[in-house]
């Protein structure tokens, strides 16, 4: 660090004009290996370090001689030397030195306003760094937290440590001043006592400004004589402006050093213990080495190591400098944390209330479950970009994506930028069933080269949720999965298709049993035309690759154990139709053509619902009929009986349709059970036979295992109740 002009003159005056004191001279002030123009190094506040051959009795003389020799007037020209007699030894306290100095000054009657004030000003210049040099960064990293916090916060302040390069130049036997070294407050108090003793002619001595005696609290570096003198937090005299600025710097640096320098020892667990966890030790060591800034303490989550709130920051790197950095220009003005810079925002986790900073970050493009959620293009257009990027890139991208999205039907509504329907689309399925029929088959035209490439869609942007091609493919996959499969209808089944099998919308479609084609001949039927079953005939036959409708075999259920086949095409086309209407109380169709629409499961479900309703009504009607009294001979009794008859007759007529529906469905189900009884009987017989065959196979496998054991052991093991050929040789013997 370069010395200022006053400090250079002070060093020259020390080396040339200091009177010798015993064996001490100015040349011996400098440690070995240092040039005369280098600054002196202090071990304690205000105390210089010198070589071992320096006289211990001249310690205070050195300190005070620098004060007087730093002034423009040489001490040798005075009629009376400022200090007479032998100097005190090193064991004498600093307060006694100052008191003796005050008594000698009182004897000499030196005018304080003319002599001491310039000397103290130069002394403050030498020992205390100026305001302009307070922000130097060379010595800032080597300061102790006690230098920043001041003596008022640490009453027992020991000698300040020197930087490593300074300690190497200090002789091992060099004496040092006491830990209670000269502070600005002690200097001010002793000088004020001297003023009271000296009389009113020295009234100007008390007007020494506090910035010249107290250390600015923002001082970080030392020029010339050593570390700065730390004063109390309260100024001696008026100087509130400089002190207020110093307080702001003090709180700032105190927060910095509170994190940078830990107060405890590093963690050292017992590695020979059974409870020692190396991962836990590593985490504790990381927490100790890189502490977090003091802030609201959040509960530690044992399962997740990700912070849920961006409240705690690291020990701070960019916070030291007050200059404008590239990271500070990208800071969002609406961030919750004042330290949350733009470089830290993308690395923050996403959870619950954890998006406090990310919600305000204009580049937040996230992938939701229901569709692609994109932030508004107005925010994206106002995002600060590095110099050299084109402002029209976002507008070109918006126009390109909007144009291509309108051409593509399946994803045009979900990817329209800036549309207010984006938020509602996130909670709905990507393709509602009401819109599936209106979607055109030529939707895969989205894969044409009309889509802009990744290079065209802003390759300069860094935080995109998904690439364009991946989003495009996912949209096509969802479209192809929701696309219904169109089939050709059987002859005469165009009207039957509208009221096909239906189950609840939340459940899969019910399986359809084509019992007429499985067991019965194609010519048998109950009531309808030839070749048609009135209740169980398929109304939709899927087409094979040759364009011919494939019918199920008559022996599918009877001779094989194949699973019951369903119609996947009818699931997407007919859900919420027949069964919900039947359960709601509507009358079943009575013609043969309408009866052929229902499947077996639907018929069973409808029959059970209607039968339960009919049974409940019959119980109620029976109770009313039993409680009704016989008609009386009076006119009033006859009127009441007639009214009761009308109500009863009306109730019976209303439930006549329910009774007929139950009877009709019951007859159909009974006939179906009778027709399927041989099939069911055959299936049960085969199951029983298969069970016996499985048991015999298990016994045979067990016998083979025993035979293998016999061959390995060299002996014959005879199973129970199973005579073998090995018994005959034993019988002959």
From Swiss-Prot:
Gene3D superfamilies cross-referenced by the UniProt entry: 1.20.58.60
Keyword flag Ubl conjugation: yes
Ranges annotated as biased composition (Basic and acidic residues): 71-80
Record-listed Phosphoserine modification sites: 315, 453, 459
GO biological process annotation, one example: centriole-centriole cohesion
Bias (Polar residues) ranges: 231-241, 540-569
Keyword terms of this UniProt record: Cytoplasm, Cytoskeleton, Phosphoprotein, Ubl conjugation
Post-translational modification: Phosphorylation by PLK1 is required for binding to BTRC in prometaphase. Phosphorylated directly or indirectly by NEK2. NEK2-mediated phosphorylation promotes CEP68 dissociation from the centrosome and its degradation at the onset of mitosis.
Chief place where the protein resides: cytoplasm
GO molecular function, one term: protein kinase binding
Record's keyword annotation contains Lipid metabolism: no
Record field: compositional bias (Low complexity): 178-190
Localization (cell): Cytoplasm, Cytoskeleton, Microtubule organizing center, Centrosome
Region (Disordered): 71-92, 150-207, 222-244, 420-442, 497-571
Entry GO CC: cell junction; centriolar satellite; centrosome; ciliary basal body; cytosol; nucleoplasm
Domain of life, source organism: Eukaryota
Subunit-level organization: Interacts with CNTLN; the interaction recruits CEP68 to the centrosome. Interacts with the SCF(FBXW11) complex which contains SKP1, CUL1 and FBXW11; the interaction is probably mediated by FBXW11 and the complex also contains CDK5RAP2 and PCNT. Also interacts with F-box protein BTRC. Interacts with serine/threonine-protein kinase PLK1; the interaction leads to phosphorylation of CEP68 and its subsequent degradation. Interacts with NEK2; the interaction leads to phosphorylation of CEP68.
Role: Involved in maintenance of centrosome cohesion, probably as part of a linker structure which prevents centrosome splitting. Required for localization of CDK5RAP2 to the centrosome during interphase. Contributes to CROCC/rootletin filament formation.
Name of this protein: Centrosomal protein of 68 kDa
Primary gene name: Cep68
């Amino acid at each position: 660090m370069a010395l200022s002009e006053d400090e250079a003159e002070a060093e020259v005056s020390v080396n040339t004009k200091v009177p010798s004191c015993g064996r001490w001279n100015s040349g011996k002030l400098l440690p070995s290996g240092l040039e005369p123009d280098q600054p002196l190094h202090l071990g304690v506040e205000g105390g210089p370090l010198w070589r071992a051959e320096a006289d211990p009795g001249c310690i205070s003389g050195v300190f005070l001689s620098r004060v007087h020799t730093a002034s423009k007037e040489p001490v040798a020209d005075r009629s009376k030397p400022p200090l007479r007699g032998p100097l005190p030894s090193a064991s004498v306290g600093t307060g006694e030195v100052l008191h003796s100095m005050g008594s000698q000054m009182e004897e000499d009657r030196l005018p304080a306003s003319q002599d001491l004030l310039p000397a103290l000003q130069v002394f403050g210049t030498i020992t205390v760094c100026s305001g302009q040099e307070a922000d130097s960064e060379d010595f800032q990293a080597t300061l102790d937290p006690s230098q920043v916090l001041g003596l008022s916060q640490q009453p027992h302040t020991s000698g300040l440590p020197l930087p490593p390069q300074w300690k190497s130049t200090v002789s091992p036997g060099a004496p040092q001043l006491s830990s209670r070294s000269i502070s600005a407050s002690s200097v001010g108090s002793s000088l004020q006592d001297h003023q009271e003793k000296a009389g009113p002619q020295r009234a100007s001595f008390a007007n020494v400004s506090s910035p010249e005696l107290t250390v600015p609290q923002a001082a970080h570096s030392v020029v010339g004589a050593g570390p700065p003198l730390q004063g109390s937090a309260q100024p001696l005299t008026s100087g509130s402006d400089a002190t207020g600025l110093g307080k702001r710097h003090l709180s700032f640096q105190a927060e910095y050093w509170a994190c940078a320098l830990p107060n405890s020892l590093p963690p050292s667990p017992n590695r020979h213990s059974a409870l020692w966890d190396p991962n836990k030790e590593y985490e504790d060591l990381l927490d100790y080495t890189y502490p977090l800034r003091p802030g609201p303490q959040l509960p530690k989550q044992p399962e997740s190591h990700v912070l849920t709130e961006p409240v705690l920051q690291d020990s701070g790197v960019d916070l030291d400098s007050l200059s404008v950095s590239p990271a500070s220009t990208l800071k969002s003005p609406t961030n919750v944390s004042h330290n949350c810079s733009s470089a830290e925002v993308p690395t923050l986790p996403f959870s619950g209330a954890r998006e406090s900073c990310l919600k305000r970050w204009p580049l937040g493009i996230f992938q939701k479950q229901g569709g692609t959620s994109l932030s508004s293009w107005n925010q994206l257009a106002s995002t600060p970009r590095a110099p050299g990027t084109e402002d029209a890139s976002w507008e070109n991208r918006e126009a390109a994506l909007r144009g291509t999205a309108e051409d593509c039907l399946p994803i045009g509504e979900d990817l329209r930028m800036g549309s207010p329907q984006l938020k509602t689309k996130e909670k709905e399925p990507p393709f509602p069933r009401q819109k599936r029929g209106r979607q055109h088959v030529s939707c895969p035209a989205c894969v044409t080269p009309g889509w802009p490439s990744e290079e065209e869609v802003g390759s300069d942007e860094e935080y995109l949720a998904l690439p364009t091609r991946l989003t495009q493919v996912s949209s096509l996959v969802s479209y192809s999965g929701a696309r219904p499969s169109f089939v050709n209808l059987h002859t005469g089944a165009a009207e039957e298709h509208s009221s096909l099998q239906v189950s609840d919308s939340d459940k899969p479609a019910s399986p359809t049993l084509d019992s007429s084609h499985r067991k019965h001949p194609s010519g048998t039927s109950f009531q309808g035309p030839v070749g048609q079953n009135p209740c169980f005939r398929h109304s939709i036959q899927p087409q094979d690759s040759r364009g011919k409708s494939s019918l199920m075999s008559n022996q599918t259920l009877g001779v094989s154990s194949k699973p019951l086949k369903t119609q996947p095409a009818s699931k997407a086309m007919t859900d919420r139709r027949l069964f919900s209407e039947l359960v709601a109380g509507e009358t079943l169709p009575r013609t043969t053509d309408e009866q052929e629409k229902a499947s077996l499961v639907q018929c069973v479900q409808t029959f059970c619902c209607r039968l339960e309703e009919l049974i409940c009504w019959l119980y109620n009607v029976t109770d009313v009929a039993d409680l009704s009294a016989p008609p009386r001979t009076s006119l009033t009794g006859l009127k009441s009986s007639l009214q009761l008859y009308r109500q009863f007759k009306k109730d019976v007529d209303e439930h006549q349709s329910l009774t007929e529906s139950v009877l009709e469905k019951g007859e159909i189900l009974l006939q179906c059970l009778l027709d399927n009884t041989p099939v069911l009987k055959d299936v049960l017989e085969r199951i029983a036979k298969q069970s016996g065959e499985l048991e015999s196979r298990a016994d045979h496998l067990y016998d083979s295992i025993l035979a293998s054991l016999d061959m390995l052991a060299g002996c014959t093991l005879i199973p129970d109740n199973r005579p073998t050929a090995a018994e005959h040789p034993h019988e002959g013997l």
